[in-house]
Amino acid sequence: NLDLRIAYARGFRSPSLRELYFNFFDANHQIIGNPDLKAETSHSFTGSLSWKKISPSEVAYTTIFSGFYNNVTNLIDYAVSANDPNIFILTNVSKSKTAGVSLTSVVKYKNWNVAVGGSYTGFYNVYVEEDKELPQLQWSAEANTNIGYNFSKIGLDANLFYKFTGKKPGYVFDNTTQEYIQSEMKGYHMADFTMNKKLFKHFSLNAGAKNIFNVKSIKNSVIGNSVHASNGISNIAYGRSYFAGLSFNWNKK
């Protein structure tokens, strides 16, 4: 069973009132609105090819290969102030492009549900406007796995999610040499575990752990003269956390 889909979309987004006029201040950073923001416009292309099969032993297979390309004009984004690195100002990026491909496979058998996927995404290099020799897109890989099992006799679902984010390349401008130098953010691993238990007819109990590997920050490095030098860190998460909750779902039939 094959399914091919191709789509095109023309996008338009006006800046929100928050982006135009809202100013936010706290102890760590400041965000400044910009009343001169222009509306975003974009062209988006997507495509996917999916394959499904159910074997005689009732194993269900699904594989999806997809790709996308986005071309955005006047992208609304945050820029660091030249006077203070703790101040972020909303601005328009004249050009921005993203592209990528992904492959996902899902296998379902009885109470098991296993999904494995990967993607390769290219992010626009803003410095290419100043130096045409730089690559237009900077590529980064991701891989993820989700394993779920349903304990049907006791009404319990357990799910383990894992994701690897590969190193993300970039460029920085060296004021000393007046050159663009390649940089990169290191890759990292994330994992979550959740459980859901049905209680009575309308209640369910959920609990689990997020960010099991306790990832908080990732090192950035600058690559120059075949030497990797530390260039600070990027904060990406709050660390490991645990949660538990009780939910109520009422459906009148």
State where each predicted segment sits:
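Transmembrane beta-barrel domains of outer membrane proteins
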Residues: R5, A9, S48-K52, T104-K108, ...
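C-terminal beta-signal and adjacent terminal beta-strands/loops
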Residues: F12-R13, T73, K110, S152, ...
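Transmembrane beta-barrel strands of outer-membrane/channel proteins
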Residues: I6-R10, E19, T63-Y69, V116-Y120, ...
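Outer-membrane beta-barrel translocator domains and adjoining extracellular loop/strand segments
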Residues: R18-N23, Q30, L75-D84, T121, ...
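A general structural signal for well-ordered alpha-helical segments in protein cores
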Residues: T46, A158, F243-A244
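Gram-negative outer-membrane beta-barrel transporters
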Residues: S57-T73, I89-F173
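Outer-membrane beta-barrel signature, preferentially recognizing the C-terminal barrel domain
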Residues: N1-D3, R10-N71, A82-K108, Q136-S140, ...
